Amino acid sequence: MATISSILPCHGLLQHCSSSSSSSKPKFSSQNLVQLQSFSNGFGLKLKTRVSTNPPLLKVRAVVTEETSSSSTASSSSDGEGARRLYVGNIPRNLNNDELRTIVEEHGAIEIAEVMYDKYSGRSRRFGFVTMKTVEDANAVIEKLNDTEIGGRKIKVNITEKPLEGMDIATTQAEDSQFVESPYKVYIGNLAKTVTNELLKDFFSEKGKVLGAKVQRTPGTSKSNGFGFVSFSSEEEVEAAIQALNNSVLEGQKIRVNKA
């Protein structure tokens, strides 16, 4: 097969190529490439039709980007759903979604109001969530409804993105101090973290006269230790509670009930 070098004499296309002993730099012009293109078609070579040896001028355009200020970012995030979503706790067990909406919407525009229910028993978990339309509405509801009474119960209203222990520590300590001791008492283990003293009392009241109910918590906090005690007025009620409620489900968890 014929080669390009055999067709094009050195003094033609490659006359400027230097020998290995030459100290001068090799020169190669765009005119040479144009000549080579005309011959390359017959050999199936793919060469660009023209290559400029003069590099084009680079046009550099400065692009100015506008940074979003931290204050505007904070403002945007504060208008997010988390800042408008309220936790409403310690509500009456018979309060439903519509009634919760009616109570809250007196103080601001609402998007969603929902009471939480236990998926196993279908009983109200005594708390719900309300999403307001604006942060201002949410703040107004907290101001007007937090620590007010509904159905004889003092409710707690907070923004959900604030860290919540589930209850106010002072309230929890006050409830614990009201626990009535009795020789007729049961131990309840494997309690869900959401179980409150009031919920525990209501759950066991179906099986006897409950004198006191207490979820054991880490001292100085409202963090549940996962167990509690319920006191009754008689031995018969203790036996009835153990027989009926041991291995029953409370707040989605199977509890253990034994004599304390």
Swiss-Prot record:
Q: Name one GO biological process term.
A: chloroplast rRNA processing
Q: Could you tell me the superkingdom of the organism this chain comes from?
A: Eukaryota
- Residue limits of the RRM domain? 84-162, 184-260
Tell whether ATP-binding is among the UniProt keywords.
no
Q: What are the entry keywords?
A: Chloroplast, Plastid, Repeat, Ribonucleoprotein, Ribosomal protein, RNA-binding, rRNA-binding, Transit peptide
Annotated InterPro entries:
Euk_RNA-bind_prot (IPR050502), Nucleotide-bd_a/b_plait_sf (IPR012677), RBD_domain_sf (IPR035979), RRM_dom (IPR000504)
Give the SMART domains listed for this entry: RRM
User: Which subcellular locations apply to this protein?
Assistant: Plastid, Chloroplast
Query: Which molecular function terms from Gene Ontology are attached?
Result: mRNA binding; rRNA binding
User: Where do Low complexity bias regions lie?
Assistant: 63-78
Question: Which SUPFAM superfamilies does the protein's record reference?
Answer: RNA-binding domain, RBD
Checking Pfam families in the record gives: RRM_1
Q: Which GO terms describe its cellular component?
A: chloroplast thylakoid membrane; ribonucleoprotein complex; ribosome
Task: Give the function comment from the record.
Answer: Component of the chloroplast ribosome (chloro-ribosome), a dedicated translation machinery responsible for the synthesis of chloroplast genome-encoded proteins, including proteins of the transcription and translation machinery and components of the photosynthetic apparatus. cS22 may have a role in the recruitment of stored chloroplast mRNAs for active protein synthesis.
- Similarity-based family: Belongs to the chloroplast-specific ribosomal protein cS22 family.
- For this entry, the protein name equals Small ribosomal subunit protein cS22
